[in-house]
Amino acid sequence: MRVRVSPTAPYKCNLTSFDLYIRDYTVLRMRILFIGPTRVGDTILATSIINHYINKYKSSEFTVVTSSVSQNLFKKMPQLQNLIIINKMRFSLHWLKIWSKVFIYRWDLVIDLRSSVLSYLVITKERKIFKGNNYDHKVVQFTKFLDTKEKIIPEIWFDKNDVDDAKKILPVEGPYIAIAPYSNWKSKDWALLNYEKLLQRNIFQNYTIILTGLSKDIADKEIMENLLSQKNLKVLNLFDVPLSQMGPIFSICDLFIGSDSGLMHLAASSGCKTIGLFGPTDDKVYGPWQNVVIKSKTSPHDN
């Protein structure tokens, strides 16, 4: 087919349909490389950046580099073209392997939250390298990083079908309160005995209690068994349920209570009212975004 083209246009005058497709695809599709954090909580907070660019560039395509513990968070991410998992190797050779997958492309934008050398070894029109601080909340830091006046919010991705599937996992009717008593650091955790005492209060009698986390983190197995077998409470054991399922489950809970952990941020980003229990970590930087923090001067485990 013949097309009239401006003399200044960089395209030849005799274009085929394939040429037009390639031209339009190149113009409309913005290719973005996102190098994300390692930990689940940081990754969830960083979804505020991804969502900002998804909304800004409706036809963009993302390649996301993330850790194995965070990969399930991206199952329903819009505009995701490729997900690259960091499987650590000796001498940091995993970065060479990742580079071999991304250097072949010309990127429109590279966003690097790790300040890694990888972002300097690819061709891109724009490169944004994040440098954090120890006093602003992470979302505030990300807002400054993006240099935007728009409100950015950490939100994970799931749909109505995911919520319907989540309801099928729950054999007992709600309303629900979710509790995640463990993190990856014992000093951040409130003693399990305190949760047992808390759940004896009358306010919890009308709720189904969801206990969740990783079973390998359970330190007080006897107390946990007592909690799970409470006769005056409806308690569900949802330990080791994947993150991709816990997000929709949290979205139908009335409240989340738990340690400073990835699950705390997952609950908050799913729209669940969240109470985060903090001790040695800084709630001003890592608190659940736009939710409630209870802070102790010492480790919650000691209280």
Residue ranges and their predicted role:
Residues 3, 17-303:
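Catalytic machinery of carbohydrate-active enzymes
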